[in-house]
Amino acid sequence: MAITKQDIWRAADELDAEGIRPTLAAVRKKLGSGSFTTISDAMAEWKNRKTATLPSSDPLPVAVNEHLAELGNALWAIALAHANARFDEDRKQIEADKAAISQQLAEAIELADTFTRENDQLRERVNQLEPMERERDKLADQLAEVKRRSGEELNRCMEKLTQRDNEAIEARKQAKEAIERAASLQGQVEALKEQVANLTAVLKTGGKQ
């Protein structure tokens, strides 16, 4: 069954009687269903009718109006003083926050400047080290070349020493053989001398006879 305008008004009246503000959602919940557009149109008319049916109030006495005006002025002064005090507190807090932020910003800038200087110093050191590294690499290559040549020269010297050792051994062997031959020849010479002496003696003896 479609929900009628009277259903919506009745739900709104019941909510109002229960002390519940008849919002669109509250009325729809009370009804259990319904289009928000339909409920909105009906509630607009319900509010207009409710305003029109309110009894007009009698004008307040002048003394009451004056008292209310004084009370309103006093309340306004209190509210204004409170607002000014709150504004001062907020302004002081804002100034304090601003000072803190400025301090943090200054520290951040100082730290950034420090990092920048350190970075520049490191870059300069790197630039200074690059030629040194190239020179080191050059010296390392030269040292490797010297080691290679020294190794080759050492090998040649060792070969020469080995050759000389072999030659010395051969020379000692030949000298030993020469000494042995000389000793043999010396023996032969001594034997020949003895033979010559004997022959000489024999010849001398034969001549005397």
Curated annotation (Swiss-Prot):
Protein origin, superkingdom: Bacteria
Annotated InterPro entries: KfrA_DNA-bd_N (IPR021104)
Record keywords: Plasmid
Gene3D superfamilies: 1.10.287.1490
Function text: May influence the expression of the nuc gene.
Name the UniProt record assigns to this protein: Uncharacterized 23.2 kDa protein in nuc 5'region
Native source organism of the sequence: Shigella flexneri
